[in-house]
Structures are given as C-alpha cells and as structure tokens.
C-alpha cells in the first residue's frame, strides 16, 4: 500500500484530504505542522507529500526544499483550500501509477 504524507495545520482540511486519499486505497499519515512533517519523513516511507499553500513559521517552498533534501524520491504536491480535491486525488493516483510526476 502506498503511503502519502498530508501536511496541513487546519485539521478539517487535512482530514478531508486524508479521507479522499484513503478512499483510493492509500495509507495516509497526517502532520499538523512543518516540524511534524519533517519528523514523519524520518520515520516513514512515502511516495508523495501534500503540502498546503500556507504554513505558520515557514514557507511551503522552504518545507518543500527540506523534504527534497531529506527524501528526493518523494513527489511533493501543493494543494490550496480552494483547489479541487478530486484533481489532487487524481494527481496522487497518477504518481502512484507512474503516469505523472508532481
């Protein structure tokens, strides 16, 4: 089963993304901050990470760069709260299936 890291400080948004991905058969690990995301990357194996457009205490780009240094094999997808969830899920499915890169 492919694992996805979902990072979002807003629990309702994070949980909505997690449920949608779980519905497609993914194992989802949730992180409520950039610090938690870094910890989870050290502890797990992921094919992709979903980052929000806004983070407290750091930028999405800084976290993306850090994750890229720690685990370059992970595809990173940035998802804003106004973006369509079904497109995110399709993108993650395409990454899993080897059809697309982030």
Locations of the language-model features?
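Acidic, metal-coordinating helix/loop segments flanking the phosphotransfer/catalytic sites
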Residues: 32-48
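Conserved phosphotransfer microenvironments
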Residues: 14, 47, 51-69
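A short, hydrophobic beta-strand element within the central beta-sheet of small alpha/beta folds
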Residues: 49, 64, 73-83
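Two-component/phosphorelay signaling modules centered on CheY-like receiver
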Residues: 11-29
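Conserved N-terminal glycine/acidic-rich loop preference
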Residues: 35, 54, 87-91
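Conserved acidic segment of CheY-like receiver
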Residues: 1-11, 17-18, 49
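Receiver (REC) domain switch/output surface
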Residues: 85-102
């Amino acid at each position: 089963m492919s694992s996805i890291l979902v990072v979002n400080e807003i629990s309702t948004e994070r949980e909505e993304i997690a449920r949608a991905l779980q519905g497609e058969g993914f194992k989802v690990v949730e992180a409520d901050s950039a610090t938690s995301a870094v910890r989870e990357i050290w502890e797990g194996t992921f094919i992709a990470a979903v980052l929000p457009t806004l983070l407290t205490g750091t930028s999405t780009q800084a976290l993306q760069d850090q994750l890229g240094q720690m685990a370059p094999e992970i595809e990173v997808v940035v998802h804003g709260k106004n973006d369509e969830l079904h497109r995110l899920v399709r993108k993650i499915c395409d990454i899993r299936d080897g059809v697309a890169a982030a």
